Amino acid sequence: MSPVLAGVLQLVALIAALALAYRPLGDYMAKVYSSDKHLRVEKWIYKGIGADPDTQMRWPAYLRGVLAFSAVSVLFLYVLQRVQGSLPGSLGFRSIDPDQAFNTAASFVTNTNWQSYYGEQAMGHVVQTGGLAVQNFVSASVGIAVAVALVRGFSRSRTGELGNFWSDLVRGTVRVLLPVSVIAAIVLVACGAIQNFSGIHSVGQFMGGSQQWNGGAVASQEAIKEAGTNGGGYFNANSAHPFENPGPFSNLFEIFLILLIPFALTRTFGRMVGSLRQGYAILATMVTIWIGFTALMMWTEFAHHGPAFQIAGGAMEGKETRFGVGGSSIFAVATTLTSTGAVDSFHSSFTGLGGGITLLSMQLGEIAPGGTGSGLYGILIMAVIAVFIAGLMVGRTPEYLGKKIGTREIKFAACYILITPALALVFTAAAMALPTPGHSMTNSGAHGFSEILYAYTSGANNNGSAFAGLNADTQWFNTTIGIVMLLGRFVPMVFVLALAGSLAEQKPIPATVGTLRTEKPLFTGLLVGAILIITGLTYFPALALGPLAEGLAS
């Protein structure tokens, strides 16, 4: 079987698996977030944290809950790393330095999982399981909660109430993420991923000498790392490591986990707003971009540019032979179009245009299908922008799902789409202009610029992957990327919740003959066009200096 055919068959199998899971999971999540009942274990949690799950919150109160919980999480994870040397199960590792502890705490709480450290050489069992893995669950649940709050803004009327943050947080963790992760961990263990609390083993090598291998609760962390679109690896090699991702089936299964919840949330959206066709329109937009980018990536990586590529069956530099070009390309697009950032290959070693696709995938705002929760609210913001543009073209007041998109709403949406590129581009410019950050670049020219741009784009979009030729473990990058991750996560949430509150207060407008039918293919095309044009206008100058220049030169 040719490598190209193998890659296409993997993509077909992945689409089929996602299609089978779409309806049951999407409907289940709609029931979870619409139910008035609380499980017994949830009641214990509410009692322990002193929260009343039945109190409805307006958007400022909901936002305070998000920020307070996240602030406490950052502080807890920072302290846990700083005292690691005194904890049992530390495997002899020292406590983490202040700048790196801040960067890691910000990274995992924001669902970014950017790592400027070697996991198997820095973090013991307690920090990995009691700190990082816990944040993998709750940071993903925070994202879903904010997305659900925005959906309620569309579905509710004449009220500013968006639900209860604490209830949404606990339900997302207990009823959605935990069950999915338990099943996924069992599958990964069956595939060969390790799951233990062993110490460091010294293993003899065929050529003489020895190698140090770490044990750990890898399968359980790998499951939520992918299902929660987190991405932080137990090992430095991330999902290229055989202990995390043993073979071709586990690789395809991990891609399935990455895409599962973000795609299914469009069904949840359709259920909660009372129109499944609205959810299908959003799904069609996501799928169009995802398949288009995947096909383009496979073409760039399979394209033969000389005898070495012909023999290898594509651009194999930086890729695992057990995954091949096809599996690595599908994984790379999935991980950058979502907020995952996990890698099974070395993105810096992709072709110039292939590396540009991973960068552009993040710059779209990770909305196809995007992160767990963040993908849905991101594309709904873009839908508001698209409706507004359509309204300007025909001279009508824009409406979406029966809600008027006025000056106030469009200001919130505009601020949302501006904050992330501003963070990425401003900090990239600062790093290139100042002398000290440049010392971390191992490559010069267009590729070196791409490394810096990729790092800040990854941080601002809460992705976490990297062009790993950059030495990011410095005070400058640990501090600035940490700040970018926090601002890139929580400032957009302010505008999302403010928009949700504004929409929830409105009286629904009945559809008329002139109302734009947002469930039709025409709107899907308009939305895809708006996403690509806005992204292109924002990032094209920077892309021209980096991956485009490198790709054309080669």
Curated annotation (Swiss-Prot):
Protein family per UniProt: Belongs to the KdpA family.
Listed Pfam families: KdpA
Official protein name in the record: Potassium-transporting ATPase potassium-binding subunit
The gene coding this protein: kdpA
Subunit comment: The system is composed of three essential subunits: KdpA, KdpB and KdpC.
Primary location recorded for the protein, binned into one broad class: membrane
Lineage: Bacteria, Bacillati, Actinomycetota, Actinomycetes, Kitasatosporales
Transmembrane feature ranges: 1-21, 60-80, 131-151, 174-194, 246-266, 279-299, 375-395, 412-432, 481-501, 525-545
GO molecular-function term, one example from the UniProt record: P-type potassium transmembrane transporter activity
Keywords from the UniProt entry: Cell membrane, Ion transport, Membrane, Potassium, Potassium transport, Transmembrane, Transmembrane helix, Transport
Membrane topology: Multi-pass membrane protein
Function per UniProt: Part of the high-affinity ATP-driven potassium transport (or Kdp) system, which catalyzes the hydrolysis of ATP coupled with the electrogenic transport of potassium into the cytoplasm. This subunit binds the extracellular potassium ions and delivers the ions to the membrane domain of KdpB through an intramembrane tunnel.
An annotated GO cellular component: plasma membrane
